[in-house]
Curated annotation (Swiss-Prot):
Stated name of the protein: Transmembrane protein 150A
Membrane topology field: Multi-pass membrane protein
Main localisation: membrane
Organism the protein comes from: Rattus norvegicus (Rat)
Glycosylation sites: 37, 41
Compartments reported by the entry: Cell membrane
Record-level GO BP terms: catabolic process; phosphatidylinositol phosphate biosynthetic process; protein localization to plasma membrane
């Protein structure tokens, strides 16, 4: 077991704690309304008597979407930090898992596609975290439109990869757990998108709740990689970064692909 096992857990713990902290700050600073609030008005007149605590009069501008919670300072600063650090950890996890599967001689387009979608998810998170929705709406929506579907596709691809590699009852239990998380992610992302397109306050609030469930679900999924990361080593990172031609060497009389860095001895022997 290596220290790499802490990376997926750290991503989940850091990001989940961070976004809930951002939400709490946004509520206390009266930048959004609490998630338990379902009552929205067309407009609200400022009440000087109200100081501190959550808003009691809410409009559609106060719907507690995750992005909305991180729009204004000081919570926007923490939101950007979470987005940047979370994106780095996501990319590192994707790269290590990709290399781990290569070490197991599991060379497939699914593994490569999963790496691409995971890194795309990370890139989208950087854009979402650094371009707040009220200040750079187009860029923020582009980032979200890239990050969320890419994250969902990454989850689905790794469900397939893990299921086909499961060999023990514990592996199968983890495969079923990840499948459930993938289904929840798919349903909540679709519902969030559908609800968000409507101007109804109830549907907008429903979109916010679905978005929260989707993000938390994806973060929990990333945390489950600690199951495999006990076997990760520095060689795993080398395997992930190794150029494709070096991996594509086949041993004599076999169709299996070798993951060794140097195939020259084999070539000389064949000569």
């Amino acid at each position: 077991m290596t220290a790499w096992i802490l990376l997926p857990v750290s991503l989940s713990a850091f990001s989940i704690t961070g976004i809930w902290t951002v939400y709490a700050m946004a509520v206390m600073n009266r930048h959004v309304c609490p998630v338990e609030n379902w009552s929205y008005n067309d407009s609200c007149s400022p009440d000087p008597a109200e100081q501190g605590g959550p808003k009691t009069c809410c409009t559609l501008d106060d719907v507690p979407l995750i992005s909305k919670c991180g729009t204004y300072p000081p919570e926007s600063c923490l939101f950007s930090l979470i987005g940047n650090m979370g994106a780095f950890m996501v990319a590192l996890i994707c790269l290590l898992r990709y290399g781990q599967l290569l070490e197991q001689n599991r060379h497939s387009w699914i593994n490569t596609t999963a790496l691409i979608t995971g890194c795309t998810n990370a890139a989208g998170l950087v854009v979402v975290g650094n371009f707040q929705v009220d200040h750079a709406k187009s860029l923020h929506y582009i980032g979200a439109g890239v990050a969320f579907p890419a994250g969902l596709l990454f989850v689905c691809l790794h469900c397939v990869l893990f299921y086909h590699g499961a060999t023990t009852p514990l592996d199968m239990a983890m495969a079923y757990l990840r499948s459930v998380l993938a289904v929840i992610a798919f349903v909540t992302l679709v519902l969030s998108g559908v609800f968000f397109l409507h101007e109804s306050s109830e549907l907008q609030h429903g979109a916010a709740l679905c978005e929260w469930v989707f993000v938390l679900d994806i973060l929990i999924f990333y945390g489950t990689f600690s199951y495999e990361f006990g076997a990760v080593s520095s060689d795993t990172l080398v395997a992930a970064l190794q150029p494709a031609p070096g991996r594509a060497c086949k041993s004599s009389g076999s169709s299996s692909t070798s993951t060794h860095l140097n195939c020259a001895p084999e070539s000389i022997a064949m000569i």
